[in-house]
């Protein structure tokens, strides 16, 4: 708890400095950080390798090790992502509305930082930089708590970040890492209302549920991604296959990858064998319901848990449905309100799907893999919010701000 109190207090103080920093000052610091990350590539890879070795010794699946791994190319991508944040419009100070009331008061509504943001996440060291940079750009101090499996990578990245920001004249406590990765410290952080204004969990279902059950700090939930592809009877077959292969196989370990295929009964017999052939190239394990298994003889029988799981692996659950409404009901029962897709050339069916499916992002004839700040065209994001209050979907710079009313008068008093 001592580490949390010390760093929480320092973050609170730093947040006051950051709130007054100009866009020019922040961007200059971020450009320096981008260069410093590249300059420290060798040492970052050395520390990351310690995490990789430890993960392999523990028998961690390769798909999960991929989330942990840094390479020269990935560090270059992280560095480039910092520059992309520099190019984004700074929302701080933006006046979103202004008007005069009956008392002739001029009332303005402007964007301000949230204050101090806490982020609890798992085994993706790039999040250490992404989260730091987004919070910094929006004038927020941030306290990060990563997983134990990435601790050496995170400590090395934090050292580069803090040294770089300090060299640009910013407090080192603008961005901090909790190095104690125990569950007890994580739970203490969830109750750090004295210093944290908001807590954002990034990770699997277990982590997010733990945060929701234990946190007293306000939480923005970035949900798990049990995403579905529904292939309608009016779907173009090759388009559907291409989208499914992309959504499942391009990067199965991320939250916007597809986990379940729902297929209309009228096209199942024609579609499923060709789909199976396309997925064999990636050694995808198929877990199918009874009707789908009549067509896919080599598939495994799907269990109830298969409809609920975020596999994050080359595994696909498959269910044959009688109608779009059955597909919608299945998604709303088992989905995580993240990203859902329908493949159909029938306009009315597509409209019904997007109106009835409860998700942050609903796709018509496109892959779920586009649920990402950069892919959607508004820049880096801190995570994908699956809740409805404050933010929903990819959380960019604007979602890391609050608003403040500024009222100008010339002596008015209220009668």
UniProtKB/Swiss-Prot annotation:
Q: Which reaction does it catalyse?
A: L-glutamate 5-semialdehyde + phosphate + NADP(+) = L-glutamyl 5-phosphate + NADPH + H(+)
Question: What is the role of the protein in this entry?
Answer: Catalyzes the NADPH-dependent reduction of L-glutamate 5-phosphate into L-glutamate 5-semialdehyde and phosphate. The product spontaneously undergoes cyclization to form 1-pyrroline-5-carboxylate.
Q: Which InterPro entries match?
A: Ald_DH/histidinol_DH, Ald_DH_C, Ald_DH_N, Aldehyde_DH_dom, G-glutamylP_reductase_CS, Glu-5-SA_DH, GPR_dom
Q: Name one GO cellular component term.
A: cytoplasm
The places in or outside the cell where this protein is found are: Cytoplasm
Sorted alphabetically, the keyword list is:
Amino-acid biosynthesis, Cytoplasm, NADP, Oxidoreductase, Proline biosynthesis
Task: Provide the taxonomic classification.
Answer: Bacteria, Bacillati, Bacillota, Bacilli, Bacillales
Q: Which GO terms describe its molecular function?
A: glutamate-5-semialdehyde dehydrogenase activity; NADP binding
Q: What is this protein called?
A: Gamma-glutamyl phosphate reductase
Its chief place of residence is cytoplasm
Q: Which SUPFAM superfamilies match?
A: ALDH-like (SSF53720)
Native species of this protein? Listeria innocua serovar 6a (strain ATCC BAA-680 / CLIP 11262)
